[in-house]
Amino acid sequence: NESAGKSFTNSERLFPSDFKMDKLYIWQKTINEEEVLNSYKKHKKIEAYKLSKNLKNLDVGVWNIWHGGIHWSLKKDGWDSRMRIVEIIKEKNLDIVLLQETYSSGDFIAAELGYYFTTTSDWDYKYQGANISVISRYPIKEVRVAEETEFNNVAVKISISKTQEVWAMSNWYGMNNFPKVFDFHKSRFKGSDSIPVFFGGDFNAVPHTDGGKSPASKKMIEEGFIDAYRNMYPDVKKYPGFTHKEDLRIDQLYYKGKGLKNSFTEVISTWPSGFPSDHFLIVSKFELTTSEENGMNIEK
């Protein structure tokens, strides 16, 4: 894995992003989270999202943003990739986004949206930020990462209302580490009737349902997950659903849980003012039902 990672880094010519610091403040003590927030509020207006008792709809996205959104800049192109990513997520009103190739841009994107943000750390991209992350309109309460797969998977438990929680898991593969991730999350997969699971990302493989040989797609379907796009559009020839500029459907969103109904899924590959990635954005809208029977209620 180490040699493969170094080879990939060299081939893709990934280097630290060229960011400029406006101001630097130094404290002679460790400041707490409230002090951090108060300092941040001076520069950006933010409002905490108030949780409702029950949420009836949830919009989820999956997006590989291509090297942290560094390929278009104001100086060179007249527009900034990262701000375009923010613009699209905001326009689509997404509640949760599973991001890949986040690198040093994840916290920036989350801050611009006023969202919660979680990522991992890994040796290969320690100077650029980690590969995968999750941003969420709603509070992130728990983080799970399997040993030796920080580059491939991060799972977060999110409180989407006062009575509901979901697991959101962002992924990027080479298939070698998929079995480790799958086994690590088995208990969470089994408990999806109580806490639904969204498992999506860049699998770098075409699903078996589309004529590909992805071991991940087969395993996920066997586990009871639903492929959001292919389930809604079963005709592969009529609706190929490509998620990459080379006409491949290598990004997918799988979901599992009794209280979930996928009411709409689309793949966004263009944008009027310019599209910022070589991977396309998957957007799915879910209707949520909550009852004692389906287990989505966490109220004590």
At which residue positions do the language-model features occur?
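Extracellular glycan-interaction patches encoded by glycine-rich segments
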Residues: 1-23
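Short phosphate/oxyanion-binding micro-motifs
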Residues: 96, 114-121, 144, 149
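Active-site regions of metal-assisted phosphoester/phosphodiester hydrolases
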Residues: 24, 31-87, 129, 133-300
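Acidic helix-start/capping segments at beta-turn-to-alpha-helix junctions
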Residues: 102-107
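Proline-aspartate-enriched helix->loop->beta-strand connector
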Residues: 85-98
